Amino acid sequence: MSDDHPYHVAITATAARDLQRLPEKIAAACVEFVFGPLLNNPHRLGKPLRNDLEGLHSARRGDYRVVYAIDDGHHRVEIIHIARRSASYRMNPCRPR
């Protein structure tokens, strides 16, 4: 774990694929956000999701959403999915842990 951030990041294969498909400027903004402010305080920057996506959080980056899970016990933020808002909540709620 880095001394600079209280949390470290894990990116799922789905989120990595999402990043590759994003426009370059959006992808760069998402990476900067994930490895910067999000790791400092993931509870503050996102909002908790409900219903089928309970246990996940979502943070805005323009028209895009970064969906992530927080593991406080291991000080880890797992990036699950990155997509336009209109598609970001249609994901399968079953996710690796």
From Swiss-Prot:
Enzyme class: hydrolase
The entry's keywords: DNA-binding, Hydrolase, Nuclease, Repressor, Toxin-antitoxin system, Transcription, Transcription regulation
Keyword flag Transferase: no
Physiological role: Toxic component of a type II toxin-antitoxin (TA) system. Has RNase activity. Overexpression in M.tuberculosis or M.smegmatis inhibits colony formation in a bacteriostatic rather than bacteriocidal fashion. Its toxic effect is neutralized by coexpression with cognate antitoxin RelB (shown only for M.smegmatis).
Full protein name: Toxin RelE
Inducing stimuli: Expressed in log phase cells (at protein level). Induced by rifampicin treatment. Expressed in human macrophages 110 hours after infection. Induced in the lungs of mice infected for 4 weeks. A member of the relBE operon.
EC number(s) stated in the UniProt entry for this protein: 3.1.-.-
InterPro entries referenced in this protein's UniProt entry, alphabetically: RelE/ParE_toxin, RelE/ParE_toxin_dom_sf
An individual GO BP term: RNA catabolic process
Family per similarity comment: Belongs to the RelE toxin family.
A single GO molecular function term of this UniProt record: DNA binding
Disruption phenotype: No visible phenotype in culture or upon infection of mice.
Subunit structure: Interacts with cognate antitoxin RelB, which neutralizes the toxin. Also interacts with non-cognate antitoxin RelF in vitro, in M.smegmatis coexpression of these 2 genes increases the toxicity of RelE.
Name of the gene encoding the protein in the UniProt record: relE
